[in-house]
């Protein structure tokens, strides 16, 4: 079943063939994320879609929670793991710690990132805090203000 779009500006609808290019074994995904996925078909579609987002953008920005094992909580963490795998500039706003972090030298380092590439990806938790909203607004203001 198709998903209902919440917005109509620049949607990209992926064909079955395009989705398959982002396919990955659930075993590998579970191992990379240090967790187990049960609703495999639903989760597979989400992971396939996230693959295309990260593959099309260069710099990756995520809002979520960095866990002790350096992964990021939830499905959002898949965008983070792919960005690490693809060697992309990667930044996470950790809502719990209320700060931006950049993945550098195999660890999270506090940072104040800017959008500085022609293409970027935004991903994140569906539980966006007021702080998270402010962080996104500030990221755009700092990146694009003259």
Label each region the model flagged:
Residues 1-145:
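Acidic/glycine-enriched connector segments
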